[in-house]
Amino acid sequence: PDWPTLTVIQHGRDAHAPEIQAANIDRRHGYLSEDELLELQNACMFHVCPSLSEGWGHYIVEALSVGAVVLTVAAPPMDELVTRERGLLVPYERVGEQRLTSTYYFSAAGLQAAVDRAVAMSDDEWARMSANARQWFQSNRNDFPLRVRSALLESVQ
């Protein structure tokens, strides 16, 4: 589609996926240095994180930390990290299993609709969602030591 450039970072077994030929896809193979990754994370207004499942969602939280508006699957735990106030949720069309976890397969039409909405988003709406993403990250990071302390105290009582 006629969308802005999509930067795709792949490593490991995913790096051998079939090459998609499109002028607006910048596909990066292999691991990036920390500086390269930080530069890309901060340069992109939107981060597309279409995970089938997540343990905690590190790359989603990294996206929120830079104030990116995240597009991710409307399933746990992704939708616990990204809400409508700080991102765009993509519906899933089926659920599978991988060992002891559920996998959520996003709807291609839903992802296209979310990208279309992101592209059409006003500067004010993006700025509000971006600020909400960054604020959530800062609050989560600042409250983490207290939550750990509380959990540890509860576990020894």
Please provide the spans of the model-predicted regions:
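A charged, aromatic-enriched C-terminal amphipathic alpha-helix characteristic of glycosyltransferases
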Residues: 120-153
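Short alpha-helical segment that forms part of, or immediately flanks, the ligand-binding pocket
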Residues: 38, 61-65, 76-80
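Conserved catalytic-core segment of nucleotide-activated headgroup transferases in glycan assembly
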Residues: 1-34, 103
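Short alpha-helical donor nucleotide-sugar binding micro-motif in glycosyltransferases
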Residues: 38-44
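A short hydrophobic beta-strand element within the catalytic core of glycosyltransferases
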Residues: 47-48, 71
